Amino acid sequence: MYHFCRKERRKNMSIFNQFITTKESSISGLTDELKAIYIQSRYQDNSIVVVTNTLYEANILFQRLKSYTNEVLFFPMDDFLTSEALAVSPELKTTRLETLYSLLKKNHQIVVTNLMGYLRYLPTKKVLNNKIISLKVNHDYNMNELIQKIYSIGYTKETITSVTGNYSTRGFVIDIFPIMEEHPIRLEFWGDTLDSIKYFDENTQKTISSLSEIKIFPNTET
């Protein structure tokens, strides 16, 4: 059986509860293909969160829905999760974070999750938005304060930045591999002024391209 909810805006609730409504429905007795077709048809005018019993069922439905629409997101959580196992599945965590920040950008989407994912405590949109770091070239920032903020939003310091969720520093340079990005970025400072923002290859450490601004999304769900 699948359970799904339709959208209605609410304040001071988690991002999922702001995204959906109390109008809830359950469907059963359909093939996986028909479930995907039915959910996609209901999505035309409403945002939907679909809750399955297990992660396996959620993944199957997500893959089916992707063949009908690009407006589908996945929020996976281990079915038998304990507090000691929170860091066991970094790939699932990255997928969850990408889904949360996609919802910040665009409300009208389908979200597929399993029961444990739906029960996961999540912050409000306001809390998530307040943790995003926005940087622009030729603007002034206190480098030490910026490093502290990067650490506070879930990034791990390493000697070399090559994996999503890591950052490193040397002199007036901060390297960071933000979630939602295919490559890490290099922040080069001249004093307190952000002199350049560049994508670089995580393997060769060579510059790929420059950009004028960047948003660094938190690497944490809380």
Protein language model regions, located:
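ASCE RecA-like P-loop NTPase motor cores
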Residues: 1-222
